[in-house]
């Protein structure tokens, strides 16, 4: 365990976009998709540490209206998720990645055989000579995150009151 990894007892919160990550009240795997951005592929799924001292301030700076949906997930449950692909495991690690203005910031990192999966995963899948089935595996492991996340869906206003 490296110094930035979070302990299994911690919770993290993922704020989700109701337009692209929820359909008819159901959380979609897209809520946990790594995206390709103009400045490069995402390396982790953005979350906030629920028990961090700055959590309420940080999350309210992100959602000033306090009405966005969010899900609370236990780090221990996240890190128990595993999926085997081509004799290598896909696993999650949750690490603190604080910034100057958002100190409760953390990320859910996806690894394949010890390599961080970035964006659509081409970087890791090419290292292991894994082809077209790779997208299927990424969706399958994201569905496991959905199973954890859908247990505790709430709103920013509700979670800040807790």
Residue ranges and their predicted role:
Residues 1-43:
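Glycine-rich short-loop/terminal segments
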Residues 2-8, 36-43, 51-162:
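Conserved NAD+-utilizing ADP-ribose enzyme module
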């Amino acid at each position: 365990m490296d110094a930035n990894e979070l302990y299994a007892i911690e919770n993290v919160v993922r704020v989700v976009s109701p337009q692209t990550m929820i359909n008819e009240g159901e959380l979609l795997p897209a809520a946990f998709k790594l995206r390709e951005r103009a400045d490069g592929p995402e390396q982790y799924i953005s979350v906030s540490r629920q028990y961090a001292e700055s959590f309420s301030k940080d999350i309210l700076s992100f959602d000033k209206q306090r009405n966005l949906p969010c899900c609370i997930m236990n780090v221990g449950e996240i890190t128990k998720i595993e999926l085997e692909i081509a004799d290598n495991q896909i696993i999650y690690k949750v690490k603190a990645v604080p910034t100057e203005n958002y100190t409760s910031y953390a990320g859910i990192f996806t690894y394949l055989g010890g390599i961080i999966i970035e964006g659509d995963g081409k970087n890791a899948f090419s290292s292991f000579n894994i082809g077209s089935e790779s997208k299927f595996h990424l969706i399958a492991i994201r569905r496991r995150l959905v199973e954890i996340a859908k247990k505790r869906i709430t709103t920013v206003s509700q979670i800040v009151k807790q």
